[in-house]
């Protein structure tokens, strides 16, 4: 075990960025349980003098464990940070790795927890907590497994850089986080797809294999600003074709991917940073956006505003 840990640290040393250079590699290996516990501490202490940020907790646990972040290490990190000590000091000799993990996890998770408001019973209700949503709308079933890195062969041999969520044809798909629609249309691999960049520019969310003939939410266009939980499209099985609007995927599903962007040169290149989102999808499954179909189309049951990016609605 000690030898394995030493090897992990040695590998990390090779990719730790000189501060003038952007991070070029992230192995996101944090369990749902670890994220949930750290998030609970963040929410619990949000209004206390000593606020425990969940990213600080996870980054401290990660630099102590070579990025593995077991729940026991996360609990210890949270307890240690309750005192008057910085994360770097709490990590001791391993504190030199803290900055890397903090930046990496901030890019992966930075937009997930914060202040938001929902419109309920005739008024806007401010809240603090998980402000992002499962990509699958409330009331619709799905299944998935950790398939990140599984081989793919259409076009060329490559690794699967996302998580496939199997569900029913036409299942409403929503934006996990708010941002700007950066890509939209046909792709020979992903079929009908939407790409949304987070407001801070660090996260690029990719939603692919949308429904033939009716892939996108009405009126959605490139350049639009979308809210977390906003309807963006419908589940299908389009793709694997140079010709548009073709179903060559055998099973109806959503391909959901997350790319981290520390520098614009990384956005489209041979060394893009896509992370395993399986555990993240599990975390988000408890927070789903509700829609109802009316004569006017699909309508959100509880309108939403991200208060970290917009003012409190009048």
Where are these regions (language model features)?
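Sec-dependent signal peptide recognition
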Residues: 2-10
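Structural recognition of the beta-strand scaffold that forms the well-ordered cores
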Residues: 164-166, 173-175, 195-197, 204-208, ...
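Surface-exposed, glycine-biased beta-strand/turn segments
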Residues: 84-192, 228, 282-314
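Conserved, short, structured surface segments that act as functional micro-motifs
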Residues: 224-295
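Cationic-aromatic interfacial patches
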Residues: 3, 17-99
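Zn2+-dependent peptidoglycan hydrolase active-site motif and core
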Residues: 176-219, 243-251
């Amino acid at each position: 075990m000690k030898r394995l840990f030493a090897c992990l640290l040695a590998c990390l040393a090779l990719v730790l960025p000189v501060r003038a250079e952007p991070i070029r590699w992230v192995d996101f290996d944090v369990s749902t349980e670890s994220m949930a516990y750290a998030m609970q501490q963040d929410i619990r202490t949000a209004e206390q003098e000593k606020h425990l940020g969940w990213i600080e907790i996870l980054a401290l646990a990660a630099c102590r464990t070579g990025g593995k972040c077991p729940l026991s290490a996360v609990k210890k990190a949270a307890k240690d940070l309750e005192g008057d000590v910085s994360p770097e000091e709490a990590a001791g000799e391993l504190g030199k790795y803290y900055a890397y993990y903090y930046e990496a996890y901030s890019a992966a998770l930075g937009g997930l927890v914060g202040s938001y408001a929902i419109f309920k019973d005739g008024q806007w209700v401010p809240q603090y907590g998980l402000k992002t949503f499962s990509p699958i709308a409330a009331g619709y079933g799905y299944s998935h497994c950790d398939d990140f890195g599984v081989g793919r062969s259409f076009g060329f041999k490559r690794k699967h850089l996302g998580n496939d969520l199997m569900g029913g044809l036409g299942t409403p798909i929503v934006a996990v986080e708010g941002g700007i629609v950066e890509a939209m249309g046909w792709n020979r691999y992903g079929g009908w797809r939407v790409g949304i960049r987070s407001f801070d520019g660090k996260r690029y969310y990719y939603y692919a294999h949308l429904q033939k003939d009716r892939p996108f939410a009405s009126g959605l266009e490139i350049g639009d600003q979308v809210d977390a939980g906003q309807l963006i499209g419908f589940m299908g099985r389009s793709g694997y074709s140079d010709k548009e609007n073709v179903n060559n995927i055998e099973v109806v599903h959503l391909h959901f991917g997350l790319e981290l962007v520390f520098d614009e040169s990384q956005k489209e290149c041979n060394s893009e940073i896509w992370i395993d989102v399986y555990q993240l999808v599990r975390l988000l499954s408890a927070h789903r956006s509700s829609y109802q179909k009316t004569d006017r189309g699909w309508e959100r049951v509880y309108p939403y505003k991200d208060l970290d990016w917009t003012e409190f609605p009048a």
